């Protein structure tokens, strides 16, 4: 029997149900590493938020804990995108790479920094995320986490952004040369209110 390269369209709902037997039936005719065709990201099974039981089943089936989607993002990148940081420690425990880089050369910590929640950044660093990482993308150029924090230069997020900046700097993150320009722009926005 020839195995499918793609996952059933309702795979995310099946995983959400937490029913390991239903998932086993749904993927029995799928290759290891099969992807979701309807997604621009070409998500693999490990990319969907899942219970420990589902995660264990998928790993026992042979799925890769560090599988890559179309943009080279890993399941840990995916958990950041889905705002399911609570599942990251288990992925790390099972071999997930918290410092894996995607096609933009960014680690999952860049995604957490983008949401500007210092408590989440602190968790990621405690779990092993490197705050000193510098992404070097052909599309976006070089980016430090401190620079990425201020890239939108929004006064509305200034308090949260500055909390994240302070946290990153306290953990040895390099300073981006664009920070002073971003801070001046945020201050200019503040003065116009």
Region spans (language model):
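Conserved ankyrin/ankyrin-like repeat signature
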Residues: 22, 53-54, 86-87, 119-120, ...
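Ankyrin repeat domain, specifically the short helix-to-loop turn at the C-terminus of the second helix
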Residues: 25-32, 56-64, 89-97, 122-130, ...
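Ankyrin-repeat-protein effector appendages
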Residues: 1-13, 127, 147-193
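Ankyrin repeat A-helix N-terminal signature
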Residues: 13-18, 44-52, 78-84, 111-117, ...
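N-terminal segments that cap or nucleate solenoid repeat domains
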Residues: 1-48, 53-57
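Ankyrin-repeat boundary/"N-cap" motif
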Residues: 4-11, 35-47, 68-75, 101-108, ...
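A generic tandem-repeat structural signature
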Residues: 64, 68-117
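Ankyrin-repeat and related helical/solenoid repeat scaffolds used for protein-protein interactions
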Residues: 104-163, 167
């Amino acid at each position: 029997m020839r195995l499918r390269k793609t996952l059933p369209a309702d795979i995310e709902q099946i995983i959400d149900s937490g029913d390991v037997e239903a998932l086993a039936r749904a993927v029995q005719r799928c290759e290891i590493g099969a992807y979701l065709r309807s997604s621009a990201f070409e998500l693999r099974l490990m990319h969907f938020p899942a219970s420990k039981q589902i995660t264990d089943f998928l790993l026992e089936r042979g799925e890769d804990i560090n599988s890559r989607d179309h943009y080279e993002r890993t399941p840990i990148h995916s958990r950041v995108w889905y705002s399911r940081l609570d599942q990251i420690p288990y992925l790390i425990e099972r071999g997930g790479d918290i410092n894996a880089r995607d096609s933009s050369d960014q680690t999952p910590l860049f995604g957490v920094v983008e949401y500007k929640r210092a408590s989440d950044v602190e968790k990621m660093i405690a779990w092993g995320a490197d705050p000193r990482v510098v992404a070097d993308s052909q599309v976006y150029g070089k980016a430090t986490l401190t620079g990425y924090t201020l890239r939108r230069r929004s006064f509305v997020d200034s308090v949260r952004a500055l909390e994240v900046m302070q946290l990153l700097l306290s953990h040895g993150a390099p300073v981006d040369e664009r920070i002073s320009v971003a801070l001046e722009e945020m201050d200019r926005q503040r003065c116009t209110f």
